């Protein structure tokens, strides 16, 4: 059981490194113009699927276009992963938007505003 978790975690880290490198240096899709950050990768127990959570910085239009570009590049990314990482099955790449960073920034702004208001009251 623990061996599978270790293997899954190790594969997630390797995938994160390789996919980040591909997005930065190799994918030439003009839709991918916003800054993309891979926040997490979840690999299923059978190692057949990898959910790649991405945070995209930019306007709403840039986010939408960039996400569409990433989804269309999933096949290329899977092919390249198969060439670069030796494993029995190459996982299918599924991109998911991660809003946690935006959510955290909003909470931080709210807390700053509350602290500012509290300071004004004193």
Curated annotation (Swiss-Prot):
Q: Which Gene3D superfamilies match?
A: 3.30.300.20
List the disulfide bonds in this chain: none
Is the keyword Cytoplasm assigned to this protein?
Answer: yes
Q: Which GO terms describe its biological process?
A: maturation of SSU-rRNA
What InterPro entries is this protein classified in?
KH_dom-like_a/b, RbfA, RbfA_dom_sf, Ribosome-bd_factorA_CS
- Report the locations given in the UniProt record: Cytoplasm
- Pfam families in the record, alphabetically? RBFA
Mind telling me which PANTHER family this protein's record contains?
A: RIBOSOME-BINDING FACTOR A, CHLOROPLASTIC-RELATED
Instruction: Name it.
Output: Ribosome-binding factor A
**Organism of this sequence:** Caldanaerobacter subterraneus subsp. tengcongensis (strain DSM 15242 / JCM 11007 / NBRC 100824 / MB4)
* Gene name as annotated: rbfA
